[in-house]
Amino acid sequence: MSNVKQVLTIAGSDSGGGAGIQADLKTFQMRGVFGTSAITAVTAQNTLGVFDIHPIPLKTIQAQLEAVKNDFQIASCKIGMLGNAEIIECVADFLADKPFGTLVLDPVMIAKGGAPLLQRQAVSALSQKLLPLADVITPNIPEAEALTGIAIVDDISIQQAAKALQKQGAKNVIIKGGHSLNSQSELCQDWVLLADGRHFTLQSPRFNTPHTHGTGCTFSACLTAELAKGEPLQSAVKTAKDFITAAISHPLNIGQGHGPTNHWAYSRL
């Protein structure tokens, strides 16, 4: 398998295994790419919540990135939890010359249980430093609102937010609809704005389950894997949508709270 594609995740570690680095590597494995990692923070968490966050020293983050760069041919890279402005600036400076191919930015801000994973003052650093480097950004609705200052209440405002993210530098925008504009809707709709101005939506059934921990990480990791394999963005987004839909709709029922998704589900359909 000398032609296996190599990818990188830059994110936090989740001791509960449902999100972050752990979810990314599981997804990479299931999608047939070789995953490498640079850990930005170690979190103590499980399905019930986040109990401690320990940011990794900047020199250690940079050393991880250097180690990956010097030995692997990374076709695409995803960024997840960064935690604070200093880490954002460290990562952005390293990625300035795009050493890791296509860059997918998942602007992780809040854990599924509500715990903040990005300091409030770091949002502007994310907008100014990383958005201009992103080939694709994958915020959910609350994250898109935080990055743009636009209250997303309908289809018009979600389009405005997507265009605002493009103006900040992101080339392609995917606003995920898990946090529905209509809480009674039976559908989950993602809104996609491509670099050339075309846009489309992707729909899936909405499932009444608490086991959605790590959905954003898993979606963006699958997208990263498909882009590494050379899939066009529209096709890659569709695969990522199908992958996470399968993962949510076949829950593992692990833990006492917001449990993880099922990374095996898509391959077993």
Swiss-Prot record:
Function: Catalyzes the phosphorylation of hydroxymethylpyrimidine phosphate (HMP-P) to HMP-PP, and of HMP to HMP-P.
Identification of the protein by name: Hydroxymethylpyrimidine/phosphomethylpyrimidine kinase
Metabolic or biological pathway: Cofactor biosynthesis; thiamine diphosphate biosynthesis; 4-amino-2-methyl-5-diphosphomethylpyrimidine from 5-amino-1-(5-phospho-D-ribosyl)imidazole: step 2/3; Cofactor biosynthesis; thiamine diphosphate biosynthesis; 4-amino-2-methyl-5-diphosphomethylpyrimidine from 5-amino-1-(5-phospho-D-ribosyl)imidazole: step 3/3
PANTHER family: HYDROXYMETHYLPYRIMIDINE_PHOSPHOMETHYLPYRIMIDINE KINASE THI20-RELATED, PHOSPHOMETHYLPYRIMIDINE KINASE
Keyword Iron found: no
NCBIfam families: HMP-P_kinase
Similarity comment: family membership: Belongs to the ThiD family.
Gene Ontology biological process terms in this record: thiamine biosynthetic process; thiamine diphosphate biosynthetic process
GO molecular function, one term: hydroxymethylpyrimidine kinase activity
First and last residue of the signal peptide: none
Keywords in alphabetical order: ATP-binding, Kinase, Nucleotide-binding, Thiamine biosynthesis, Transferase
Top EC class for this record: transferase
EC number: 2.7.1.49, 2.7.4.7
InterPro entries: HMP/HMP-P_kinase_dom (IPR004399), PM/HMP-P_kinase-1 (IPR013749), Ribokinase-like (IPR029056)
Species of the source: Haemophilus influenzae (strain ATCC 51907 / DSM 11121 / KW20 / Rd)
Cited Pfam families: Phos_pyr_kin
